[in-house]
Structure formats: structure tokens, C-alpha cells
């Protein structure tokens, strides 16, 4: 069994300091460099193998990357940030927020790890630089570099398949999909996982995918535009239901449908993803798959703590399932 005395001897700090750190003494005042060095030695000597019941309280950073031009999408990530801040306060952790990755890179020595929130693109070269100076990181909802960092994400493929199965159970076989394009990574436009899953799963079920409309950013404005495009092409041949990739898009689509006197859920039904606050107040209120943000934050912090004390383990990507919150846009009779 590795002892505190051995860690103190190799790290060059007193046994009292080491003991207070490893036992989460709230009154201990030491620099981040000191904390990092002690934890590094504890990891190297295998201290945690004999003390698996202990849970350290690291000093962490929040890397927050959002596009403030899109209010509803911004609200989703703002809510994630608020959940993280509240949880950090509850658990008596220390956290500082960074809005620019270069600032975090410059200050990396002050932290044991970071949580990433937001969907704004980051250059791969910057992520590599960050990993060199702060390798312990967990991204929430997205992961721009799964080969470098951990992530906790909603299980979107499961959600899409669940939606299709639910429609089919309720006798709906003409199903459309409205979505935006995926994120850019090093200037390369990726396809969105929701649209990929929709097309592939529909084909495995032998169902028509002609009502698939994927274009542009995830925004209310683009949702409105896509709603108009769908109606211009298919108003006399609407599917029985649409799955829409996010509430942000769904609000715009619903506005376009209302303007063209398309009655939801009579003429076509709608299922959406995210279950943001606004979907309760549109007309009709949207049935939407809920993403449990608090659970994602709790899992992210647990994963980060585990990574800090097990830095040599492989990176992990955890997918969390969603649950449907039923409102008036689609009320399933069979679940």
C-alpha cells in the first residue's frame, strides 16, 4: 500500500500538506502547481488503487463556446452552464470560466482538468495544444476531439430510432425529417448524426425517405426557411409526421406551418429533440425528447475526477438516453 509519507517524500512536500490535499481539506491553501504535482506523484505511485473510496475535489476550468446570435440554441448551452455552476457550488469545487481556448491554454497550469460546453468550432491544432498542457478534459453534449478528450453526450441515434419506432407503433408510416447540417471541424462540414441515423434506419425499415430536408444552421430562422421549403414541395403530399432535429428548428418550422394553415397535429404531427423551455409555449406545444442536462453534468464531473486519478486510461464517450415528454403536437396512443 502506497502511503502519504511516500508521496510526500517523492513530491517534496510535507506529509501534512499531502494528507490535507488527498483528504479534501477545505481550508488548505496551496497553488495549483503544488496540487498538480502531488496528484501526479499519487497517480504514479498507484495511491488510488488502495483508496478507491476517496474522491478528490479538483480545481477545474470551464471552456464555454457558444454562438450568441442564436437565442434558443444559446439558451440550451446557457442552461448547461448554469447546471454546471450550481453543481460546482454544491460540491464545493473551484472553477473558472474561459471563453477562448487560447486563454485556457495559457492558464492550464492552474487547473487539474476542464469541462467543455458549447458547439462553436475549434481548430484541431488548438485542441492538440490544449491536450499537451491540460490533457484531462470532458466535453458535454459535443466532442470535437474524441481521440483526445472524454465526452458525455445525448444518445441521438437511439433518440431518432426511438422516434421512428414510436411513429410506426402508432400507425404512422409516412415520416419526414427536418434538420440542419452538422458541425464544422477544421473547415470540413460534417453530416449531422440525427439526419444520418434517420435515413439509414428508415431504409432498414423499408420506408420512404423522400421527405428528408437537411440544410443550413440550427436556428429558428433556418427552421422557418426549411418549413417553407417543405410546404412548397410537399404541401399536397405531406407525410403523416415529422421528426425535427432540435426544438430550435422546430419553432421555426411550426411558425411556417401555421402561416400556411397546416394544422399540427391534424394535418401532420411533430416530434422534436431537446425539450427546451420554449416548446411548452408555442402553438401547439411540442412533444419533445428530453435531454437530462443535470445528469450529463453530474456524469461529466465524475468522469473528469476519474480521469484525473486515472490519467492513463483510454478516453471514453458516454451516450445518455433521452425520454419523451408528450404534448399536443403528437400524443402517442401506443408507446
Swiss-Prot record:
Signal peptide: none annotated. Residues 1-58 form the HTH lacI-type domain. InterPro entries: HTH_LacI (IPR000843), LacI/GalR-like_sensor (IPR046335), Lambda_DNA-bd_dom_sf (IPR010982), Peripla_BP_I (IPR028082). Keywords: DNA-binding, Repressor, Transcription, Transcription regulation. The keyword Transcription regulation applies. GO terms for molecular function: DNA-binding transcription factor activity; transcription cis-regulatory region binding. GO terms for biological process: lactose catabolic process. PROSITE patterns: HTH_LACI_2. SUPFAM superfamilies: lambda repressor-like DNA-binding domains, Periplasmic binding protein-like I. Residues 4-23 bind DNA. Pathway: Carbohydrate metabolism; lactose degradation [regulation]. Induction: By glucose. Negatively regulates the transcription of the lactose utilization genes lacL and lacM. This is HTH-type transcriptional regulator LacR.
